[in-house]
Design a protein with these regions (language model features):
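Short, acidic Ser/Thr/Gly-rich low-complexity loop/linker segments typical of extracellular
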Residues: 148-159
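Short, polar/charged loop or turn motifs at beta-strand boundaries
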Residues: 36-41, 72-78, 129-133, 220-243, ...
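N-terminal periplasmic accessory domains that precede
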Residues: 105, 187-193, 237-239, 262-266, ...
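Extracellular/periplasmic, surface-exposed regions of secreted and cell-surface proteins
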Residues: 276, 439, 474, 480-489, ...
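Short, acidic, small-residue-rich periplasmic hinge/interaction motif at the N-terminus
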Residues: 49, 53-56, 93, 99-147, ...
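Cleavable N-terminal targeting peptides that direct proteins into the secretory/outer-membrane pathway or into
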Residues: 1-125, 165, 178
Length: 860
């Protein structure tokens, strides 16, 4: 029953004469190993394999349908080879096994079929190549013809040749990959691509400053793979997360392509500070919004820009969502709203692999609002006039006045002839909307050697929104490099450059003359034509303070943003398990916004045309140093200890200028000096925020059953008041892998059962600059002599006691899986309490400032 790859050693050694590297590869394939001693005291096959895994370090790949894991084994084996041990474990079972170092693949032995093996059966020689999904060759893949005692393995380049009976089914199997079966056709070439097999519980999950197996997690962490997301139809990854993880809500808060997205993890807790989660991109913490130049434009309410706009979704490998205090406390004062860790794709060993994809899609407004026709509008206007007359004169049902006693009759705005000849009128909503379009192109190349791996990509994304003139164009490039210099040192660079151009439409939510495009279209009079007899935009006689919706499409408003995000690391494995690492990076964002409201619009006519230009720059720097020690004490005690330091600063600078009263619309925003406003607007700003942090984490694994995590972080920031510059954020967690207990090990249908409990504190540092005293000069005027002078005035009172909001969170979780994780799920219960909420207290009326920021006393 036994079949080993050593049976093919003659062919392999022949190939090994060509060089030392192939020889070493072949040596691995022969599965050389030392003898072992082990005792199986009448236990199940499953328990015996677990003993070999824990005691000798072997890994096994086996299909539960191919073997009887409940069969008993009773043997005491001393100084025996692994082959003998496996034969004893699987005694009287029709299996064979392949041994590669410490990896063992157990498969059902092929059944002999006399019809296929007979001397009269037709046979032919086939050949081919076996690769993984990246196109890289797989070495040592087992290839057999089902029903025939014929088999071979692939060589160093993934090629094979084999003589098999005609019309055979060829089975390709390899440790760590899904077995594939292909039916032999008329040709002699048969290639196969194997898919990597990942056990759900052995999946590696990225956490703060590290990674660990999913089975060892003590916190509430959800992983989202990008293959599960609709890549082709979305500007940013934020749009795609809705419905992909429990406790996550994602709401588009603007019709503007690339506009803001409200992303919340476990709801909103803050009333005065921010509720955005912290984003970590390849180890670099980024802010909650994209840099946005100010706009002196009353119609600029499109929501904050999405911070992930500049990231190509096709570059993302995985997304981890950290929800509870156990998983987020490592980020301290910035983690109260949860953490989203984004990991981009890396290169793989092998020849260059080039991927290209293109997508085209359309967008339509679902449930498009049906607008009144002119005839319907007139009819309803007459009904309203009558209802208003009844109300004003207190006629039933608004009173008991006799209608005949009223002198003033009802005045209807439209007569029957007007209504009959009205027709459909103007559908303003239809005129400002359209069928949207999205198209994009992605090109990537990846590859490398065992020491140097790379991934480079380029993406072009273009979207025309469903509201006319709302456009979004993005170019992104990425380069990820990892280089293992020697056995000790390794470095890597993750860099992405992006350029975004947005055409902004006036989407304000105000009323009357401040109405945005959609508001005005929803309320405008359908009896009014788009243009009057003179060819100018018509203004409704009934709605003199609401702008003509189509005229607002004449507004020019463009934003251009450039971003360069670079993060590099150098790490050294000082001794086995002890790794020191330094991260250094920067995030450089520059934005320019130009806007012009022409005199053809209602507001532009009042202002004589209004132009503005603004610029904004945000430059963030990061320096982090960590030491991670992973070690075992005996085989029962496993430790992972992390200690680190972090410094990050955020440097913001902006400038804007605006003018009005232009003699022509031709120059738009390109000649601010030609405006004749009495007082042009000029503004500038500059700020710097710093964080200095110390953090640590201890993970303790006892018997692979009982998991403990202790985490703490100390954050200091100049954003906090001088009396509260530093905060401490601790957490603790415990997890019990109940499935590993003896009373559940033999329950076959239950593949996982784990209980998690955590308690900890995190902070919300998004309190703005409310802790400090502010003075402003703009518009602070006084008369001295015969001239008007500009002075300064206090606009904000300092509060030296102001600090972060503190969230205390308890979390209980239960993870379960059935039928080898074919069915799995998680139950979570959590309770949050937030204290030191940011609020504002009213001051005495005689003071120059009306309110001061302070901490609310009541927790929520």
């Amino acid at each position: 029953m036994k079949r080993h790859k050593i049976h093919h050693s003659a062919d392999i050694v022949g190939r090994c004469k060509k060089g030392i590297i192939p020889f070493l590869l072949c040596f691995v394939f022969m599965g050389y190993g030392q003898n072992i001693s082990v005792n199986f005291p009448n236990i199940t096959v499953e328990r015996a394999l677990e003993i070999l895994r824990n005691q000798e370090g072997y890994s096994f790949s086996v299909k539960t349908n191919d073997v009887n894991l409940r069969q008993k084994v009773n043997a005491d084996l001393q100084n025996q080879p692994i082959e003998k041990v496996l034969e004893t474990i699987f005694q009287n079972q029709p299996v064979s096994f392949e041994i590669e170092g410490k990896m063992v693949r157990i498969i059902k032995a092929p059944e002999k079929d006399s019809k296929q093996i007979g001397s009269t059966a037709e046979s032919k020689k086939i050949s081919g190549r076996v690769t993984d999904k990246q196109g890289e060759p797989l070495i040592g893949v087992s290839i057999i013809a089902k029903g025939a005692n014929k088999g071979t393995i692939t060589n160093i380049d993934g090629y094979y040749s084999l003589t098999v009976p005609d019309k055979s089914v060829i089975q390709f199997s390899y440790v760590g990959y899904d077995t594939q079966e292909l039916k032999l056709g008329k040709g002699n070439i048969l290639n196969a691509t194997l898919q990597e097999k990942i056990n759900d519980l052995d999946e590696v999950v990225v956490i703060g400053y590290g990674s660990m197996k999913k089975s060892d997690l003590t916190g509430a962490v959800t992983t989202v793979k990008t293959e599960d997301l609709p890549m082709a139809a979305n500007t940013s990854i934020s749009h795609m997360l809705s419905g992909k993880a429990a406790g996550i809500t994602s709401v588009q808060n603007s019709a503007q392509p690339g506009g803001g997205v409200t992303l919340r993890i476990r709801g909103e807790a803050s009333t005065g500070a921010g509720n955005e989660p912290l984003y970590i991109i390849d180890g670099f913490p980024v802010g909650g919004s994209q840099v946005e130049p100010a706009a002196d434009n009353r119609y600029s309410d499109f929501g904050s820009r999405n911070p992930l706009n500049s990231i190509n979704p096709n570059d993302i490998e995985s997304i981890e969502i950290l929800k509870d205090a156990s998983s987020t406390a490592i980020y301290g004062a910035r983690a109260a709203n949860g953490v989203i860790i984004i990991t981009t794709k890396k290169g793989r060993e092998g020849k260059p692999v080039v991927n290209y994809s293109a997508n085209y899609g359309v967008q339509q407004i679902a449930n498009k609002t049906e607008m009144m026709t002119a005839e319907e509008f007139m009819t309803e206007a007459n009904k309203f006039a009558k209802e208003q007359w009844l109300y004003n004169n207190r006629v039933y049902p608004y009173g008991n006045t006799n209608p005949s006693s009223i002198k003033d009759p009802i005045v209807y705005p439209y007569d029957a002839k007007d209504i009959k000849n009205a027709g459909k009128g103007t559908d303003w909503y239809d005129l400002i909307t359209r069928e949207g379009m999205i198209h994009q192109h992605n090109l990537s190349v990846s590859g490398g050697t065992s020491n140097l791996k790379y991934m480079a990509s380029f993406n072009f994304f273009d979207q025309n929104g469903v509201v006319r003139n709302s456009d979004f164009t993005r170019y992104t490039g990425r380069l990820n490099i990892e280089h293992q210099i020697n056995k000790i040192f390794k470095y890597g660079i993750n860099a992405t450059q992006s350029y975004i151009k947005s055409s902004n439409v006036p989407l304000g939510t105000e009323d009357f003359e401040n109405s945005g495009l959609i508001n005005s279209a929803m309320s405008y009079d359908p009896t009014t034509p788009v243009r009057d007899k003179n060819g100018d935009y018509a203004q409704s006689d009934r709605m003199t303070t609401v702008p003509n919706p189509v005229s607002m499409l004449e507004i020019d408003d463009y934003t251009q943003t450039k971003r360069l995000l670079v993060n590099a690391f150098l790490q050294a494995e000082i001794i086995k398990g002890l790794v020191a690492k330094i991260n250094i990076g920067f995030d450089d964002q520059n934005g320019v916004r130009n806007s012009y409201i022409p005199t053809t619009t209602l507001y532009g006519k009042q202002e004589g045309g209004k132009a503005s230009k603004s610029m904004a720059q945000q430059f963030d720097r990061l320096l982090e140093a960590t030491v991670n020690y992973n070690f075992n004490i005996a085989k029962a005690h496993k430790f992972n200890i992390l200690a680190g330091y972090s410094y990050q600063d955020f440097n913001n600078e902006g400038f804007s200028a605006a003018n009005s009263q232009f003699f022509t619309d031709i120059f738009k925003y390109n000649s601010l000096a030609s405006g004749e406003a009495a007082r042009p607007t000029v503004a500038s700003n500059k700020s710097k925020t710093m964080f200095i942090s110390y953090f640590g984490r201890i993970n303790y694994n006892l018997f692979d059953k009982y998991l403990f995590t202790l985490t703490a972080r100390v954050d200091g920031s100049n954003r906090f008041g001088e009396n509260n510059r530093y905060g401490i954020f601790p957490s603790g967690a415990f997890a019990w892998r109940i499935k590993q207990e003896d009373f559940l090990k033999d329950v076959d249908f239950l593949s996982d059962l784990k209980m998690r409990i955590s308690l900890g504190q995190t902070g919300n540092s998004e309190i703005g600059n409310n802790a400090f005293e502010y003075y402003t000069a703009a518009w602070q005027q006084y008369v001295f002599g015969n001239s008007i002078n500009t002075g300064t005035a206090k606009s904000q009172i300092a509060n030296p006691d102001l600090k972060w909001e503190t969230t205390t969170e308890f979390n209980f979780g239960l993870d379960f899986g059935f039928f080898n994780q074919r069915l799995s799920g998680t139950f979570e219960y959590f309770k949050k309490e937030v204290k030191d909420l940011l609020g504002y207290r009213s001051l005495k009326s005689f003071m120059e400032v009306s309110t001061v920021a302070e901490k609310l006393k009541v927790p929520v």
